[in-house]
Swiss-Prot record:
A molecular function (GO) term: double-stranded DNA binding
Listed InterPro entries: Herpes_BLRF2
Record family assignment: Belongs to the herpesviridae BLRF2 family.
A Pfam family this chain is assigned to: Herpes_BLRF2
Organism per entry: Human herpesvirus 8 type P (isolate GK18) (HHV-8)
Parts forming coiled coils: none
Residues annotated with Phosphoserine modification: 123
Substitution effect: residue 98 to A: Does not affect DNA-binding; does not affect ability to inhibit host CGAS
Effect of residue 74 to A: Does not affect DNA-binding; does not affect ability to inhibit host CGAS
Biased composition (Low complexity): 122-131
Name of encoding gene: ORF52
Location(s), subcellular: Host cytoplasm; Virion tegument
Name this protein carries in UniProt: Tegument protein ORF52
GO CC annotation terms, alphabetical: host cell cytoplasm; viral tegument
Domain of life: Viruses
Amino acid sequence: MAAPRGRPKKDLTMEDLTAKISQLTVENRELRKALGSTADPRDRPLTATEKEAQLTATVGALSAAAAKKIEARVRTIFSKVVTQKQVDDALKGLSLRIDVCMSDGGTAKPPPGANNRRRRGASTTRAGVDD
């Protein structure tokens, strides 16, 4: 059996608890401010909804890339067959291994410096200019 601790917990008063809550509130505010001011916006924590949205988008992109590759291979097989029996035989022995990556679907993330380009200046009107 474990030995009891040397000193018992002291009962906190209402003032102590209020002071502790205000201290924790200030710390929480400072931490949130520090999180919001990170240099890279991708470093912030994701919410569950954002994670789920990215997961769904990634699965969709990879599925689309895989579907294109599967269709291409099946079309190749079907181009060689003429009769229904040949189709049945070809499909019976069909086994595919597909490798997909995000760059296959065209949905790969842009390079890090892609958003740092300068935008074109806004065009100005010549309404007040006399020719």
